Regions:
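Juxtamembrane intracellular "pre-TM" segments in multi-pass secondary transporters
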Residues: 2-8, 192-223
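Conserved MFS/SLC helix-loop-helix module at the cytosolic interface between two early adjacent transmembrane helices
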Residues: 64-103
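Structural signature of the two symmetry-related core transmembrane helices
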Residues: 80-94, 288-307
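Paired small-residue
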Residues: 88, 92-95, 103-111, 316-323
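Cytoplasmic helix-loop-helix junction between adjacent transmembrane helices
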Residues: 108-149
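Helix-loop-helix hairpin linking two adjacent transmembrane segments in secondary transporters
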Residues: 143-189
Length: 426
């Protein structure tokens, strides 16, 4: 069924499809180092800690890059900002295939992170303006499915190609292929993003300042929730190939379809979750109830399955990994939609820049912590249990701290005290 047939026509089916494909490319290009990890580590003589640093280093530039990316998304045409970022990250991916040592790989991972940092602030700005609340679940479900299919295809196709051609050739091919996305995107008619002059004419020049955004408890609770949830994503994204090969004895060719299946299940769940949430809203359910149900249920499923990964045999671990995929698929579209709902069209770029900046510190922490745990204990169990504990904290953040998930009245917020008390839950 096409996007237009599913009711995304008002958002612009082509825009949503291209954003989803950009998210797909984004995650293929950031995740291919994890797929290449077993080969690259042996060829270059890297330790698990060094490999963890390479996997983490992407976020050293990606995470702080969210802040200027959010600012640019609201000051310039977000479509052009996204195109420039993709050009940078596609080039960095291709050049990685030519790297000969740890230092060069580290520099290219930093460049990749800087280019990819524009993806979500620009996408959220576009969707916050273009999508109504009743369309937001499906639009974000497709965006999340692109994000989650990226590792699926990257792990499956990339893993098989690396086993055949070697990791260097695959990086070059993927980088060049990524750049081809620019042609249809730049040829797409501009989305209905209001210009700065339009906002001024509409009397919205006093729409929220960055200081006003930073005063909201909802923002800080959302940042905590994102950190706790994305820790699991980045543990799996970074270490799944090594975990399957070293712990359970799978070959590179066997690992690829297993890893891809986890991500594909997650992507399918995200599309179904987005569709179901919109149907629930149209049936009369409140936004707060719909979003919180998906956020908390997703993290609850992930928690149970992470504990199972730490405790079970190979067969049980595969089932638990599949369950983690379902949990991530439940959680991710609601994460995206919640930020867009709370921030509204005039603050979505900066809000998501801040939230993604702080939330994605998990991408820095998870690969390194897991690598250290594996080096010291010889097993992944401790890494999975840390992720499970954080997922529980994320449930508390969404259930008790974030408050009601509904559009913030920024005009009223201008006169509010710092981090005001939130209304009762409902």
């Amino acid at each position: 069924m096409s996007l237009a047939q599913q009711g995304i026509r008002g958002v612009g089916a082509r825009v949503v499809a291209l954003l989803a494909f950009a998210a797909f490319i984004n995650y293929v290009d950031r995740g291919n180092l994890a797929t290449a990890g077993p080969l690259l580590r042996d060829q270059l003589g890297l330790s698990n800690t060094q490999l963890g640093l390479l996997l983490s280093s992407f976020f050293w530039s990606y995470t702080p890059g969210q802040l200027p990316a959010g600012w640019l998304a609201e000051r310039l045409d977000p479509r052009r900002v996204l195109a420039a970022g993709l050009a940078v990250w596609g080039t960095a991916t291709a050049l990685t295939g030519l790297a000969r040592g740890f230092v060069v790989l580290l520099a290219l991972r930093l460049l990749l992170g800087l280019g990819e940092s524009v993806m979500y602030p620009t996408s959220f700005k576009i969707l916050a303006v273009e999508a109504s609340e009743g369309q937001r679940g499906r639009a974000n479900g497709f965006l999340a499915s692109g994000q989650l299919l990226g590792p699926a295809v990257g792990t499956l196709v990339g893993g098989l190609l690396m086993a055949w051609l070697g990791w260097r050739v695959v990086f070059i091919l993927l980088g060049v292929a990524s750049l081809l996305w620019l042609w249809p995107w730049l040829a797409t008619p501009s989305a209905r993003i209001p210009e700065r002059s339009t906002l001024l004419a509409a009397g919205l020049a006093d729409a929220p300042s960055t200081t006003m955004i930073l005063r909201r408890r909802e923002l800080w609770a959302s940042c905590l929730g994102q950190f706790c949830g994305t820790y699991t994503i980045y543990l799996v994204l970074s270490w799944l190939p090594v975990y399957l090969i070293n712990t359970h004895g799978f070959s590179m060719a066997q690992m690829a379809p297993i890893g891809a299946g986890v991500y594909a299940l997650s992507a399918g769940t995200s599309v179904v979750t987005g569709w179901a949430s919109d149907r629930w809203l149209l049936a009369g359910a409140g936004t707060n109830r719909v979003r919180k149900s998906a956020l908390i249920a997703g993290l609850a499923v992930a928690t149970a399955c992470l504990i199972a990964c730490a405790r079970t045999s190979s067969v049980g671990a595969l089932l638990a990994l599949a369950g983690c995929g379902v949990g991530i698929g439940l959680w991710t579209p609601a994460l995206f939609a919640t930020a867009q709902t709370l921030a509204g069209p005039h603050a979505a770029g900066r809000w998501m820049g801040i939230q993604n900046c702080l939330g994605n510190f998990a991408g820095i922490v998870a690969p390194v912590v897991t690598g250290i745990v594996v080096d010291r204990t010889g097993a992944f169990s401790g890494g999975f249990l840390i992720a499970a504990a954080l997922a529980l904290i994320g449930m508390v953040a969404y259930g008790l701290i974030v408050g009601r998930i509904e559009p913030i009245d920024w005009r009223a917020s201008a006169a509010s005290p710092l981090l005001p008390a939130l209304p009762p839950q409902g």
